[in-house]
Structure formats: C-alpha cells, structure tokens
Amino acid sequence: MAEGGGGSAVALQDLQAIAAGLPGDAFAVLGPHVQADGRLRVRVLAPGAEALGLIDGRGKLLARMQASPIDGVFEGELPADAAYRLRIVWPDVVQEIEDPYAFAPQIDESALLQIGAGDGQALRANLGARHVQVGELPAVRFAVWAPHAQRVAVVGDFNGWEPRRHPMRQRSGGIWELVLPRVETGARYKYAIITADGRVLLKADPVARQSELPPATASVVASADAFAWTDAEWMARRSAAAEPAPLSIYEVHAASWRRDGHDQPLDWVSLAAQLIPYVQELGFTHIELLPITEHPFGGSWGYQPLGLYAPTARHGSPDGFAQFVDACHRAGIGVILDWVSAHFPDDAHGLSQFDGSATYEHADPREGMHRDWNTLIYNYGRPEVTAYLLGSAMEWIAHYHLDGLRVDAVASMLYRDYGRAEGEWVPNAHGGRENLEAVAFLRQLTGEIASQFPGVLTIAEESTAWPGVTAPISEGGLGFTHKWNMGWMHDTLHYMQRDPAARAQHHSQLTFGLVYAFSERFVLPLSHDEVVHGTGGLLGQMPGDDWRRFANLRAYLALMWAHPGDKLLFMGAEFGQWADWNHDRSLDWHLLDHAPHRGMQQLVRDLNRALRRVPALYRGNHRADGFEWSVADDARNSVLAFIRHDPDGGAPLLAVSNLTPQPHHDYRVGVPRAGGWREILNTDSAHYGGSNLGNGGRLLTEPTGMHGHAQSLRLTLPPLATIYLQAEK
C-alpha cells in the first residue's frame, strides 16, 4: 500500500490519534506500507513494550524497530515485499507473532451485503470470534456490528485488555473486523467501543459462542474443533418423519432439576448421566430446556438472555452441551430449547445502546421498552437485528442439532400495545396495533427452519387469539408447528383448584377447550409458570385432604393425556412436588421415599406408555375426526367422557373422568364398537395410591343404544379418577 507522504503532518496526526486510542483508520498508518523508494515501512502499536524487532519465519532478526516519539509506536524498514514477523519484548515475556495489520480483509463484501439484507446464515458464519486460516497461519477473526461507533477495538487476555492495542477495520454496513494471529481457545475478550459522542463502552460479543461464568461478563473464544456427533440415525429419522408421532415433553430447568453435593447446578456430563435415563424411563419423547442461552441473572430463569449464541457457562463448555444433546439422541429423546427473541435486559455489557445508540432496540421507549419486565424490545424492522436473531436460531439447530425451538412471549411480539395503556404505544403504518415487522420476522423464522431443517419443531408461547399461529405461511399464518394452549391450561387448572362440591357450576371450563381444540396445532402445557409466585406445586393446588389432592392430580393428568393436543409437563409435577419451584434449589426428590409420590410417578410413566402404544391418543391430536364427545353435559356429577379415534382405523379409546369424590356404578356410556373393551388405565388403581375401584379389567358392550351409538358400556366410575378403556381388536 502506497503511503503517499507517510511523514506528512496529516499522517503524523492520524498516527497520534490511533496511538492515543482515538478514532481513525488504523490500517492506514499501522502495518507495512510501501514508501516512495520501494522499501517497506512497518509501524507497530505496542503500548508497554520495551523493544521490537522484525524477524523472518525462522526467528532471524531482519531489523530492529525504533521507538517513535509517539507513545507505544515502533517503526522499522525492510526491503520491498519482505516477509516478516514481530518480536515484541514485554517486561515479562518475549512474544513472536505475525502483524495483524499486514492482513487483508477476510470477510467477503458479498457477505456484508447479505448481513445488511437480513441474512441470518451470513451473520452466523461471519460475525463473532471465528477461527480462520490466513494461509497456513491459525488465527481468530473478530467481527462485530456497531454501525454508529467511531472506533472499535478488541481487548482481551491476548493484549492485556489494552484498548489502544488492536483497533479494528471498519467495513461497509457498520461491521468492524480484525484478524489476530495465534489467539488461543479459551481466551477472554470484549469490544471497546467509542460512541458517536465520545464515550467508551466495554461490550461483550453479541455473537460469542462461549461466555464467562456469570457474574463475570467477558466473551470467550470457543474451540474450533468440530464435535464428533454420533446421532446420524436420529437426524435422518427426524428429517424423514411425516407421520404423526407421540409428543410428550418434560420441561426442565437445568440448574435446579437436581444439584450436586455442594448445592451447585449439575454440569452437562452429570445431567446426561442422570436426567437422560430418568426421562427415558418415564417415557417422555422430548426434553424442553428453559433458556440456556447465556444470561447474567439466574433469577430470570434464562428468560433475559444476552448471549443468544452461547450455552450458559453454568453447566460447562459448549462441547459439553453438544455431548448432552448427542446422548439424548442416542437414547431416543429429542431436545427443545426455550428461545427468547422478544426482549433482552439492559445490562451495561450487553446489547443495550450497543454502540452508544439504539442498535438492537428501538430508540423510542414506546416501541423499545417492556415496562412490565423492564427489558428492551428488538427492532424487528432492522435487517441486521433480524439477521442476528435468525442466525441464533440456526446456530442452535445446525450446530447443536436441537430438535425444536419454543419461542417465548410471542404475544408480546405481535402487539404494539402489549402491556401498554392508551398513548403509550406507536401504531403501525396502517394505524393498527399489530407489530407488522415482528409478524414478518416470525414468518421468516418458521419458514427458514421448515425449509432448511425439516422435522424441527417451532412452538409458539402465544396467549391470545391471534389467528393462524400454526397455519401455513402461504395461507396467511405464522407457520409454527405448534402453539401452547394457554386457554385450556387456565380453564382446566382453575376448575381442578375448586372444591368438587363447587365444580358443577363451572363444568364448561372442562369442555370449552374442545370448541377451538383443532383451530391450531396445540400443546397442552402444565409448565413452570403454574408452580411459582406462591402458588405451590400442582399437588398443593388441588383441594381437599392429602388423599384427595393426590387423586385430583392423578385424574387431571390422565384427562390431559387423553385430551387432544400434545403434552408438556414441568419437572416435579410427575411425582407430586408440594412446594413452589425454586430456581436456586433442587426438586424435592426425597418425596419419592413416600408411596403416594411414587404412585404419581408411576402414573406418569404409564400415561406416556399408553401414549406410545395407543395410536388413537396421538394420531388424531390435531384433527377433528380424532375426537368424539360421549358425555359433555353431566355437570351435576362432574363427569365427562369422550372417544379418541385413530384416523388410520386403529382401536378407539374411551376416556371417562369422574371429578367428584362420589363413585358411580352402572354409569352407561355409548361406544362406537361392539364387543370387548379393556380398562388399560385407572388413576384410582392401588398401584398409584388409589382406592382400587374399577371395572375388573375387561367389559363387554350391551345392546343399549346411547350417545349416538347402538351399543354401550356399563361402567363403574371411581372417585376423583380418570379411566381409559380401549376397544379390543
């Protein structure tokens, strides 16, 4: 590069600015520059160094560098086109290393344009700290988006956290890039950013693949080694899956499912050794992890993340997480991640005012702040922001082989007036309350996942009546594969919390969900949100004495497993945890020393077994022809009964719930098939801690027409119980 008057006042002024850590083009004054006489002048900025030399590849000294009058700057000359390295004498060590200011830009201009157009894969491939080869030289390329910054420098373990040392190259689209040779895996780093108004901010890397253990906040250079996956068979089956399959999700907060001997969270190795066999033995098909994207505050349960590309360091390394997922797949268990694209916290080291301006968020607090949560809202109208979010989703699915994303707080994304009073929100371009940019982002998210990763689930936590959440994008929908059925959860849980004597007046809370059960592809969630803030566990929310509490919860869970929709149960409910969930302590595993809790756990095991073995319980989960009411109107007795049909013609299943303590004998229910019906599950069984009242295992229909069928069954309905009967072949 021709310097064009390297000794001029302008060049000297530029060099002084760079050396002082002020804005300027570092590559214009540092590194090798061709002089008028054809020789190379090399300038190095090394504050604190005692001496520098230019050496060849074998370490032979080519030239000693002279200290400039400008603090920290050293200069030397070489013949034209001479290859060189740097020998830097620090007070405590001699370092031999390549000159980062001799490297050409590494990111293609086309990739920068793609990022600016909202391409998540391009952002994922190019930003963050990426191991690269410059020729045969191992290096790390640091790249960050900071469009309003005057200057960005990399600081870290490799340069003594000196902000003057490694200013970055400004590229188009507000991206800054610098390749540093021989940076080792595990090195901590941040970006020192000079804002438009001259402030200096120290920020973690938004695209870091690894972070320090909180409360420390630095980013970490992740390993370049590719993980050796052993789940090819699982991945092939997932991609090819087309037929309906059982979906039963165990929702887990990894830091509190179980703790180690020092009351600390288990690492991924220990979780794999303990959690996977447990989930496998209980028969769940998937584990859903509350957010494990890096987050500064454990009390947020992960729902206020800042590192959307990094598994939290609370459980070990990124490779440790990959090992956990791989082990799940070998055990036949899918892994779903709670993923938060609705908002982020305002921690100083994070995304908030990243370059001194509203970079990831809206500048107007009427659009950019969640008052309820004191968090910031992503600006979905900015392509680089949606690229950041899309790239994160792709990272978890492609790099970590995750089987699904449960997208948190979708309702807060869809509505501009969410949680706001009149006058506190900005209408969309058409004057409405819908967040059109968020809608476009969600469609892009679900569309790209569906096309690039067939078989991966996208599940919306959406609590309103927004139409078509799971409808195809081509039909105007959002394109999710599933939506949480919050209405079903609220109605049925409130019903079960009532004293049985008062339930008759609220019978519609059990039946109303079937009015809209097939309008979306629903998951029925009994999640972490139902067991916090002083409510107690699900068992503690049931009415009556201890026996009735257990009976109520057993009946409720069996009703849930028979109801159309896929299933999700938060950890602890499967054995009847009494207390609120506490994110800082283990579940109360000692309860399994008591028979009623073991009985509850056995019931959940048997419910999952029934789900896998009885196609009628899952094949028609999202089809109206998979369900038929038998008894919907017996409010006086708090009884309901329905048929689950297998659309492929398999044996139907009758589910009957009696939600009072009064047993019923000779209770007649019409069924679609004549002949034998076998009682395959009874929550009042002594195996589960019940009174052991039931139907003796097998019943024959009688030619008494009822409920639109020519034959019926004469049943015994146990107290506070749900029974399943399946037609014999």
Swiss-Prot record:
This is 1,4-alpha-glucan branching enzyme GlgB 2. SMART domains: Aamy (SM00642). Its EC number is 2.4.1.18. Pathway: Glycan biosynthesis; glycogen biosynthesis. CDD domains: AmyAc_Glg_BE (cd11322), E_set_GBE_prok_N (cd02855). Monomer. InterPro entries: A-amylase/branching_C, Branching_enzy, GlgB, GlgB_N, GlgB_N_E_set_prok, Glyco_hydro_13_cat_dom, Glyco_hydro_13_N, Glyco_hydro_b. Belongs to the glycosyl hydrolase 13 family. GlgB subfamily. Pfam families: Alpha-amylase, Alpha-amylase_C, CBM_48, GlgB_N. One of its GO terms (molecular function) is 1,4-alpha-glucan branching enzyme activity. GO terms for biological process: glycogen biosynthetic process. It catalyses: Transfers a segment of a (1->4)-alpha-D-glucan chain to a primary hydroxy group in a similar glucan chain. The active site is at 408 (nucleophile), 461 (proton donor). Catalyzes the formation of the alpha-1,6-glucosidic linkages in glycogen by scission of a 1,4-alpha-linked oligosaccharide from growing alpha-1,4-glucan chains and the subsequent attachment of the oligosaccharide to the alpha-1,6 position. Keywords: Carbohydrate metabolism, Glycogen biosynthesis, Glycogen metabolism, Glycosyltransferase, Transferase. HAMAP family: GlgB (MF_00685). GO terms for cellular component: cytoplasm; cytosol. The keyword Membrane does not apply.
